[in-house]
């Protein structure tokens, strides 16, 4: 995402949305980072026990609503690249949005994590599995759709077949 934004000279938003969500919700950036995209309390067992706002919403709902507002505002400001945070779903009704999902095989994804974050192969595989699972749970909760399913995107690319640079070029 970031490489594409640089290539096209567009604004790029990913984890920097966390700061904006923290400002809007008055929650700490650390808390938002831990909960925001993954919303761990969205399982049926714990959902009844988590904190609620005065309006009856969970804290995770509050975070999602703030992310939604921010993503919509960013899209209104102009062309940009937004990674994750259900942005594809949030912006689905806009005619000026291209939703892209890039996936790859486990080995290459693990290698990328190892190179970027200095993890061992085992650590990379565990991190990848955990992150993907959390994203899928959160995406399903927020959208009632399955994360990574091609029908939810205008374009899906396999970086293991096409290569990272080719995905950027496309």
Regions found by a protein language model. Name each.
Residues 68, 164-169:
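Short, amphipathic alpha-helical "lid/cap" segments that border enzyme active or binding sites
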Residues 32, 40-47, 120-165:
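Small-molecule kinase domains that catalyze NTP-dependent phosphoryl transfer to phosphate-bearing small molecules
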């Amino acid at each position: 995402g970031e490489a594409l934004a640089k290539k096209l000279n567009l604004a790029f938003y990913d984890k920097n949305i966390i700061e904006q969500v923290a400002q809007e919700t008055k929650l700490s950036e650390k808390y938002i980072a831990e909960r925001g995209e993954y919303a761990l309390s969205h399982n049926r067992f714990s959902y009844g026990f988590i904190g609620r706002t005065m309006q009856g919403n969970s804290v995770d709902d509050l975070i999602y609503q703030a992310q939604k507002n921010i993503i919509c505002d960013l899209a209104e400001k102009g062309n940009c690249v937004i990674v994750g945070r259900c942005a594809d779903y949030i912006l689905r009704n806009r005619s000026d949005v291209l939703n892209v999902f890039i996936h790859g095989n486990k080995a290459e994804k693990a290698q990328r994590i190892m190179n970027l974050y200095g993890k061992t192969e085992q650590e990379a595989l565990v991190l990848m599995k955990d992150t993907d699972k959390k994203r899928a749970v959160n995406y399903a909760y927020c959208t009632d759709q399955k994360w990574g399913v091609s029908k939810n995107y205008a374009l899906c690319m396999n970086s293991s077949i096409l290569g990272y640079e080719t995905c950027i070029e496309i």
